Amino acid sequence: MLLIPAIDLKEGRCVRLKQGLMEEATVFSDSPADTALHWFEQGARRLHLVDLNGAFAGVPQNLPAIKDILAAVAKDIPVQLGGGMRDLKTIGQYLDLGLNDVIIGTAAVKNPDLVREACKAFPGRIIVGLDAKDGMAAIDGWATVTGHHVIDLAKRFEDDGVNSIIYTDIGRDGMMSGVNIDATVKLAQSVRIPVIASGGLTGLDDIRALCAAEKHGVAGAITGRAIYEGSIDFAQAQQLADSLD
């Protein structure tokens, strides 16, 4: 089970939100590159970046910070980015910077053809991000909840060549309330695409539960507030996950 530290970028700084609310931002670092190096030194084997401003604006907004992170760690570990990936040109430009993968979120819901086209243009490097509130997909930086169920959406992408699906339970994100294991497993069992859990990771019991769900197609988990506030020691958690594989 791969644990992936999240670095959420807002106006060039590393922050964490609660339930995706920009006004609920806690600043953890003024140097995202130093944060990236820290997680690499703690044993991270991949990093998850989110351009929060980009998610709301529709185009990435934190290019200097992203470049600094890539300069610091991209030679050692893969880095993925979501937030503002709404067209092929933007996706290509950011992959050319040295990102390993990009995450298509809002555009995957609004324009599923983009996912298909991106997978053809950049094979193996496209991740779909599905964010849900009570099972229904949310878009535009979680500002709008649609009438689409995430499982129905996920099934659309099965034959497109999507690398994986990141499933975020908005109600749990940043709330330290535990991962929604049931919903994550239900999604993973419904599609042939590996699913990465996100939102709510709180303690080692969540790690154990996620590892037990690996057989259902849950391939990893993204962790944010828990490792920043110290309720989970990242190195210890990854060692536990490795021991349970």
From Swiss-Prot:
Any GO BP: L-histidine biosynthetic process
Recorded superkingdom: Bacteria
GO cellular component, one term: cytoplasm
Transmembrane residue ranges: none
InterPro entries reported for this sequence: Aldolase_TIM, His_biosynth, HisA_bact_arch, Isoase_HisA-like, Isoase_HisA-like_bact, RibuloseP-bd_barrel
Principal subcellular localization: cytoplasm
Gene3D superfamilies xrefs: Aldolase class I
Pfam families reported in the protein's UniProt record: His_biosynth
Alphabetized UniProt keyword annotations: Amino-acid biosynthesis, Cytoplasm, Histidine biosynthesis, Isomerase
Pathway(s) the chain acts in: Amino-acid biosynthesis; L-histidine biosynthesis; L-histidine from 5-phospho-alpha-D-ribose 1-diphosphate: step 4/9
Name of protein: 1-(5-phosphoribosyl)-5-[(5-phosphoribosylamino)methylideneamino] imidazole-4-carboxamide isomerase
Primary enzyme class: isomerase
Family: Belongs to the HisA/HisF family.
GO MF: 1-(5-phosphoribosyl)-5-[(5-phosphoribosylamino)methylideneamino]imidazole-4-carboxamide isomerase activity
NCBIfam families: 1-(5-phosphoribosyl)-5-[(5-phosphoribosylamino)methylideneamino]imidazole-4-carboxamide isomerase (TIGR00007), PRK13585.1 (NF010112)
Compartment(s) where it occurs, according to its Swiss-Prot or TrEMBL record: Cytoplasm
PANTHER family: 1-(5-PHOSPHORIBOSYL)-5-[(5-PHOSPHORIBOSYLAMINO)METHYLIDENEAMINO] IMIDAZOLE-4-CARBOXAMIDE ISOMERASE
Assigned EC number: 5.3.1.16
Catalytic activity: 1-(5-phospho-beta-D-ribosyl)-5-[(5-phospho-beta-D-ribosylamino)methylideneamino]imidazole-4-carboxamide = 5-[(5-phospho-1-deoxy-D-ribulos-1-ylimino)methylamino]-1-(5-phospho-beta-D-ribosyl)imidazole-4-carboxamide
The organism's taxonomic lineage, starting at the top: Bacteria, Pseudomonadati, Pseudomonadota, Betaproteobacteria, Neisseriales
Residues annotated as the enzyme's active site: D8 (proton acceptor), D131 (proton donor)
